[in-house]
């Protein structure tokens, strides 16, 4: 245990307490790749005729009928050895229809070309120049940008304006600021932008019933499978499955849907089927064009096909086309997202090489949440973990990381980015050694002039944690063996408790049990006078009857907000701070402000399916 002078020096550094660096991930998204074996090359856009075909194919001239023309049922798929499975049909145009040999620059063509140029950050000249041809020849998704019966969500890139649809309607939305840090100049503009991203989707069969679909799937668990007829020739089967598992997990980390790989159920019960093919493939009504342009296509509520003529590589490769990035994009289509021309968005139609560590950005996360909602739920414990390190000048500084515990999982929350760490949640047993693997009741950090100790509580016991060695004590310097009974270390505190926290202002631990709270004086090692008391008496409601009353899930002092929070269910109450009372003396001490949803303050804390907790 640190000496009093040492602790005094540490406490002087509290004012400089800063969020900690990102904790190392416990599973990697990076794996080696194999070399490609392309067999066909895509035809390039080179002239007016092929440019007109391109604009028509992807819905720039007029919307394209796409949904409802997906692949056949699995039972109708040809066998793996079928000669047509991996071959390009010579009699079928790569664009699926015929065009005049000498297209004229009709007003519709010129207007479509201008729209395409604008959304690709090119001068809107309406003329087919080299830059426009180069943009058309970039590797891209095969899903049209504008579809019949479906609202598009096309956002102008590198601009201060957000363009609504391909019609050029402007929302005048600022997009060059980072929405994650909450510094957007207009919440109204941001809301309108998000509403545009999640424009209602209406299809023919649903329109007949008068229904408008905002979320593609109504159920919470989706099953997926890489079909046996459609393995890639470039990567091992295990590598392919791992990449797809990672892609589904990345979406699950930011939305309230679970994804599970299912290798045994009848194909009719599989929600999303994935496969590779060349040319005419997998019984699909659409043909792939060979290496160099269209790399995949997908259908709303349906299947995903990848062109095996493309050079697909694993995430760690700096060459070829990242299968992970393409898979994440196509899964977005299956879930209901349209193309988004927005810098950083995974839903851009063109493939853009990504640096290591690619993840879903703010636009993608908020777009999918507009369809499916945000992640909500209760937590077992929430706390800031304080640790010490020396900076580049050799000075001792204190830092903290914020953690959320639920069942057997935990998340590290990056307050500066207002989201969880990429790759979370992970299992408690993987990151916290020697404490119970699930169901933690409380975390307490006792921090005084004479004591610096951290404890985890569960049931009738508690554990002291050794932060230096990153594991629970078996026996501490005072000779105490762990786990200990709560009644031994904290006399007259009942167990099990609901939650607890240490208040540095009065140096009491507040233990919550049902509708009561116990203030424990750590200096005297006893319950404070006149306790227990009703929670509502110690933490009164600022607004009458707006109060948790009892059975608190978690109590948390947040260094980011310099405030105490009480959590119950999906909601939280902020405790009136000394600063709040200085600004408004009428506020009661330790009063509870109006409740709010946890997901409004701490975003994207999402479960993933249990099968995805261990990625390999």
From Swiss-Prot:
<keyword id="KW-0732">Signal</keyword>
<dbReference type="Pfam" id="PF01471">
    <property type="entry name" value="PG_binding_1"/>
</dbReference>
<dbReference type="InterPro" id="IPR033739">
    <property type="entry name" value="M10A_MMP"/>
</dbReference>
<keyword id="KW-0106">Calcium</keyword>
<keyword id="KW-1015">Disulfide bond</keyword>
<feature type="signal peptide">
    <location>
        <begin position="1"/>
        <end position="22"/>
    </location>
</feature>
<dbReference type="Pfam" id="PF00413">
    <property type="entry name" value="Peptidase_M10"/>
</dbReference>
<feature type="disulfide bond">
    <location>
        <begin position="375"/>
        <end position="606"/>
    </location>
</feature>
<keyword id="KW-0645">Protease</keyword>
<keyword id="KW-0482">Metalloprotease</keyword>
<dbReference type="InterPro" id="IPR001818">
    <property type="entry name" value="Pept_M10_metallopeptidase"/>
</dbReference>
<dbReference type="GO" id="GO:0006508">
    <property type="term" value="P:proteolysis"/>
</dbReference>
<dbReference type="GO" id="GO:0031012">
    <property type="term" value="C:extracellular matrix"/>
</dbReference>
<keyword id="KW-0479">Metal-binding</keyword>
<dbReference type="GO" id="GO:0007368">
    <property type="term" value="P:determination of left/right symmetry"/>
</dbReference>
<comment type="similarity">
    <text>Belongs to the peptidase M10A family.</text>
</comment>
<dbReference type="Pfam" id="PF00045">
    <property type="entry name" value="Hemopexin"/>
</dbReference>
<feature type="binding site">
    <location>
        <position position="329"/>
    </location>
    <ligand>
        <name>Zn(2+)</name>
    </ligand>
</feature>
<dbReference type="GO" id="GO:0061371">
    <property type="term" value="P:determination of heart left/right asymmetry"/>
</dbReference>
<feature type="binding site">
    <location>
        <position position="333"/>
    </location>
    <ligand>
        <name>Zn(2+)</name>
    </ligand>
</feature>
<feature type="glycosylation site" description="N-linked (GlcNAc...) asparagine">
    <location>
        <position position="161"/>
    </location>
</feature>
<keyword id="KW-0677">Repeat</keyword>
<protein>
    <recommendedName>
        <fullName>Matrix metalloproteinase-21</fullName>
        <ecNumber>3.4.24.-</ecNumber>
    </recommendedName>
</protein>
<feature type="binding site" description="in inhibited form">
    <location>
        <position position="141"/>
    </location>
    <ligand>
        <name>Zn(2+)</name>
    </ligand>
</feature>
<feature type="repeat" description="Hemopexin 4">
    <location>
        <begin position="549"/>
        <end position="605"/>
    </location>
</feature>
<keyword id="KW-0964">Secreted</keyword>
<keyword id="KW-0165">Cleavage on pair of basic residues</keyword>
<dbReference type="GO" id="GO:0008270">
    <property type="term" value="F:zinc ion binding"/>
</dbReference>
<feature type="glycosylation site" description="N-linked (GlcNAc...) asparagine">
    <location>
        <position position="597"/>
    </location>
</feature>
<feature type="glycosylation site" description="N-linked (GlcNAc...) asparagine">
    <location>
        <position position="172"/>
    </location>
</feature>
<dbReference type="InterPro" id="IPR006026">
    <property type="entry name" value="Peptidase_Metallo"/>
</dbReference>
<dbReference type="InterPro" id="IPR036375">
    <property type="entry name" value="Hemopexin-like_dom_sf"/>
</dbReference>
<feature type="active site">
    <location>
        <position position="330"/>
    </location>
</feature>
<feature type="short sequence motif" description="Cysteine switch">
    <location>
        <begin position="139"/>
        <end position="146"/>
    </location>
</feature>
<keyword id="KW-0378">Hydrolase</keyword>
<dbReference type="InterPro" id="IPR024079">
    <property type="entry name" value="MetalloPept_cat_dom_sf"/>
</dbReference>
<feature type="repeat" description="Hemopexin 1">
    <location>
        <begin position="376"/>
        <end position="435"/>
    </location>
</feature>
<dbReference type="GO" id="GO:0030574">
    <property type="term" value="P:collagen catabolic process"/>
</dbReference>
<dbReference type="InterPro" id="IPR018487">
    <property type="entry name" value="Hemopexin-like_repeat"/>
</dbReference>
<keyword id="KW-0862">Zinc</keyword>
<feature type="propeptide">
    <location>
        <begin position="23"/>
        <end position="192"/>
    </location>
</feature>
<feature type="region of interest" description="Disordered">
    <location>
        <begin position="157"/>
        <end position="186"/>
    </location>
</feature>
């Amino acid at each position: 245990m640190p000496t009093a002078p040492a602790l005094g020096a540490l406490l002087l550094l509290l004012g400089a307490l800063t969020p900690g660096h990102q904790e190392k991930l416990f599973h990697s998204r990076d794996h080696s790749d194999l070399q490609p074996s392309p067999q066909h090359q895509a035809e390039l856009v080179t002239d007016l005729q092929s440019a007109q075909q391109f604009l028509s194919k992807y819905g720039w001239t007029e919307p394209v009928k796409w949904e409802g023309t997906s692949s056949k049922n699995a039972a109708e798929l040809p066998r793996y050895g079928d000669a047509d499975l991996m071959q390009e049909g010579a009699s079928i145009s790569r664009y699926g229809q015929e065009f005049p040999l000498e297209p004229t620059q009709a007003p519709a063509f010129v207007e479509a070309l201008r729209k395409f140029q604008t959304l690709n950050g090119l001068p809107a000249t309406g003329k087919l120049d080299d830059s426009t041809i180069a943009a058309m020849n970039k590797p891209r998704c095969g899903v049209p940008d504008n579809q019949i019966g479906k609202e598009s969500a096309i956002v102008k890139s590198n601009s201060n304006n957000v363009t609504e649809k391909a019609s050029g309607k402007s929302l005048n939305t600022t997009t060059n600021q980072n929405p994650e840090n909450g510094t957007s100049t207009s919440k109204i503009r941001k809301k309108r932008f998000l509403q545009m991203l999640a424009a209602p989707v209406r299809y023919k069969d649903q329109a007949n019933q008068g229904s408008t679909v905002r979320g593609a799937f109504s159920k919470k668990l989706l099953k997926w499978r890489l079909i046996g007829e459609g393995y890639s020739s470039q990567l091992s089967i295990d590598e392919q499955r791992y990449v797809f598992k990672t892609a589904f997990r990345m979406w699950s980390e930011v939305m309230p849907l679970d994804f599970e790989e299912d290798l045994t159920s009848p194909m009719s019960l599989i929600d999303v089927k994935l496969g590779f093919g060349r040319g005419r493939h997998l019984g699909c009504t659409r043909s792939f064009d060979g290496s160099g342009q269209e790399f995949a296509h997908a259908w709303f509520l349906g299947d995903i096909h990848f062109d095996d003529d493309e050079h697909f590589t694993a995430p760690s490769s700096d060459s070829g086309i990242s299968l992970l990035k393409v898979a994440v994009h196509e899964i977005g289509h299956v879930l209901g997202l349209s193309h988004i021309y927005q810098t950083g968005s995974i839903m851009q139609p063109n493939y853009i090489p990504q640096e290591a560590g690619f993840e879903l950005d703010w636009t993608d996360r908020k777009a999918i949440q507009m369809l499916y909602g945000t992640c909500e739920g209760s937590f077992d414990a929430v706390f800031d973990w304080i640790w010490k390190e020396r900076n580049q000048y050799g000075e001792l500084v204190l830092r903290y990381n914020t953690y959320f515990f639920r069942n057997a999982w935990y998340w590290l929350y990056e307050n500066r980015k207002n989201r969880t760490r990429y790759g979370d949640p992970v299992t408690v047993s993987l990151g916290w050694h020697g404490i119970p693997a699930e169901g933690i009741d409380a975390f307490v950090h006792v921090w005084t002039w004479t004591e610096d100790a951290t404890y985890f509580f569960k049931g009738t016991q508690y554990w002291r944690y050794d932060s230096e060695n990153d594991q629970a004590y078996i026996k501490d310097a005072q000779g105490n063996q762990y786990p200990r009974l709560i009644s031994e270390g904290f006399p007259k505190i009942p167990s099990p408790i609901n939650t607890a926290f240490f208040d540095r202002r009065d140096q009491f631990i507040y233990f919550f049990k049902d509708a009561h709270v116990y203030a424990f004086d750590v200096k005297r090692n006893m319950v404070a006078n006149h306790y227990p008391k009703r929670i509502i008496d110690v933490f009164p409601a600022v607004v009458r009857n707006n109060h948790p009353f009892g059975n608190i899930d978690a109590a948390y002092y947040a260094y980011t907000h310099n405030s105490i929070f009480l959590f119950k269910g999906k909601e939280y109450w902020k405790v009136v701070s000394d600063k709040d009372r200085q600004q408004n003396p009428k506020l009661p001490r330790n009063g509870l402000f109006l409740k709010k949803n946890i997901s409004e303050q701490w975003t994207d804390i999402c479960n993933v399916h249990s099968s995805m907790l261990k990625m390999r």
